[in-house]
Every structure is written in structure tokens, then in C-alpha cells.
Design a protein with these regions (language model features):
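ATP/Mg2+ or Mg2+-diphosphate-binding catalytic cores
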Residues: 242-299
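Membrane-cytosol interface segments
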Residues: 29-31
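Active-site Asp-x-Gly
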Residues: 181-229
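Juxta-kinase regulatory segment immediately upstream of eukaryotic protein kinase catalytic domains
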Residues: 1-24
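ATP-dependent phospho-/nucleotidyl transfer catalytic cores
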Residues: 25, 115-176, 212, 276-299
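Central hydrophobic cores of alpha-helical transmembrane segments
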Residues: 230-236
Length: 299
């Protein structure tokens, strides 16, 4: 989602050539470059799924999202070096993330859809394995850690073995959970409601907020709202690691310091995250809302 490929003078030319907006100044925040025009702030977000953006456009212009700015051609997607971007006007929303996660959501259709997580994860496993062959023995930090996270990925896929023909309603969900990108149209997709809740639990851990919150109370409060077998599978699924490998691949296998530091931090947190999942699993077992999983050790 970030505008990694639009930096320096390039961004000024990009906006000048595509939009009727003059840049007064710019600054970096939340992994984006912000551009000020009078008292308005704008930023560019990469479009990873153009089809998804078109499909959900009605919700973006009628809901609480950052405003999409049309370009000079009357289109909302602009292209630079074969990558698609949108310009968004920042709107300040005052909200508590936990309130939005817990809030009852309306399904976007009265027709249930097939859950595709398992197939997506299998495809991603094959894709990462193929790409990894190009950098074997190039980066020790990946060579020494990738088998562990492959193991987690296989475990998550295994947990969904009974959900290959599972149907449920779809909701507006988020690719990533964080405060700033919560209202970013490029961060929205259709999925089952378990996606946001499980990713919120991940967010609490990796933002180090879980120590200040009673996770067991969050779980118990939502026992009747979610399928916790799906949530456990998604908690185990190590997208936080493989997303960084995706960035490395997108960056032509050039390892920048940000990616290195983030992977290093994830590896340092492995034991703590296992304990975190174990504690959540214990609460779920005690409340009989989940199947027993032999490979999860209760600490």
C-alpha cells in the first residue's frame, strides 16, 4: 500500500502530471509521504488489487473512508512504471480501534460465499517457496528462520482441513489492522468477519498493547460472535513474516534496513507469540468453542 516507488522529485512530477493539485510542502508519517495543499493533506497509496477497488468503489464514496481524488483523465487510478496508485485526501477520524472491531457489522450480501483462506495459503506457500530459491544462502536471517514460519503456515493450513467447503457471509474487512490504514480504501477487501477480529488480536501483540489489555475478557465477550477455529488458524498463519518477504521480492530482492529490522524483531518475539497463542487457546478450550489442537503446547 505504501508509495515506496514514488519518492523525491518523482512524486512531484507524478502529481503534477496526473492531478490538478499543487504541492505546498511534504513530510513523512505513518510510512507515507504526505502532501499539503492549503489546509488539506494528501497521500498516495499503491493499488494491489484493481478489481477489488472497482468492486467496492460504491462503499468507498458513501462510507467513512479517505476521499479518493480523481486524476486529470477523470479516473481514480493512475499508473507509474506499471504500478497502480490512487491519491487520497486525508480525513481525520476520531475513533477507538477496539470499538470498530467489536461493533456489529452488516453482511454485504444475503448469500454465503465459500471460504478461500486455505487455498490462498497453499498458493502462497508454493509462491514463496519458488521465490525463496532465488535468494537461498544470500540472507542468513531468512535461511535460519524460514523453515519455522513454513511450519506455522502448514499448521494453519492443516487446521482448515475441515473447512474446505465452508460457506459464510462476507463483510468489509481489512488487509492489515492499524489505526492509520483503517480507512484506506486500498486496505479493504471482502472476507468473513473472523478476519478483522483475528488480525486485531495480532495487532495487539505486535504493537505491544496486549500487556495492557485483558485478552481473555476480549475473547469471552465475543464467544458467540465468531468461529474461533477460523480465528485460531489465522493467528497461527504467519502473514506478518511472509508479508515482509513479499516486500523483499517486490524490491527486486534488495534487502533494505526496514525489512531486515522488522524480520529480526519478529524472530525475537517468536517465543512470546507462541505463549500469547497458547493463552488464547487455553481460554477457547475452557469455554468449549474450539477443537483440541495437539501441536499447541499449553504453557
Amino acid at each position: 500500500m505504501h508509495s515506496y516507488y514514488l519518492i523525491g522529485d518523482i512524486i512531484f512530477e507524478f502529481i503534477k502530471n496526473n492531478y490538478l493539485i499543487n504541492i505546498d510542502e511534504y513530510f513523512y508519517k505513518n510510512n507515507y509521504i504526505f502532501y499539503k495543499n492549503r489546509n488539506n493533506y494528501y497521500f498516495i497509496s499503491e493499488v494491489k488489487n484493481k478489481k477489488n477497488l472497482y468492486k467496492l468503489y460504491y462503499y468507498f464514496i458513501n462510507g467513512y473512508f479517505y476521499k479518493i481524488i480523481f486524476n486529470k483523465k477523470g479516473k481514480f487510478i493512475s499508473t507509474y512504471q506499471n504500478k497502480d496508485y490512487i491519491l487520497l485526501k486525508y480525513i481525520k477520524y476520531n475513533f477507538k480501534l477496539e470499538d470498530l472491531i467489536y461493533k456489529n457489522k452488516l453482511a454485504l450480501s444475503n448469500k454465503k460465499k465459500l471460504l478461500t483462506w486455505r487455498n490462498i495459503w497453499i498458493d502462497r506457500s508454493n509462491y514463496i517457496e519458488e521465490k525463496y530459491q532465488k535468494i537461498i544462502n544470500k540472507y542468513n536471517i531468512i535461511d535460519e528462520s524460514i523453515d519455522y514460519f513454513y511450519g506455522l503456515l502448514e499448521a494453519a493450513i492443516y487446521l482448515l482441513r475441515d473447512y474446505q467447503k465452508y460457506y459464510d457471509y462476507l463483510y468489509l474487512q481489512h488487509i492489515f489492522i492499524n489505526y492509520f490504514d483503517y480507512y484506506n480504501p486500498c486496505n479493504i477487501k471482502l472476507d468473513v468477519k473472523e478476519r478483522d477480529f483475528s488480525n486485531y488480536l495480532k495487532y495487539l501483540f505486535f504493537s505491544n498493547k496486549y500487556k495492557d489489555i485483558y485478552i481473555d475478557k476480549i475473547i469471552i465477550k465475543n464467544l458467540d460472535n465468531y468461529n474461533f477455529n477460523l480465528i485460531l488458524a489465522r493467528l497461527i498463519y504467519p502473514d506478518y513474516y511472509f508479508n515482509l518477504l513479499d516486500e523483499l521480492i517486490d524490491n527486486n530482492y534488495i534487502f533494505n534496513n526496514n525489512i531486515f529490522d522488522e524480520i529480526k524483531n519478529i524472530i525475537l518475539l517468536v517465543d512470546d507469540y507462541e505463549l500469547y497463542i497458547s493463552n488464547i487457546y487455553r481460554v477457547l478450550l475452557e469455554n468449549k468453542v474450539i477443537k483440541k489442537v495437539d501441536f499447541i503446547n499449553l504453557h
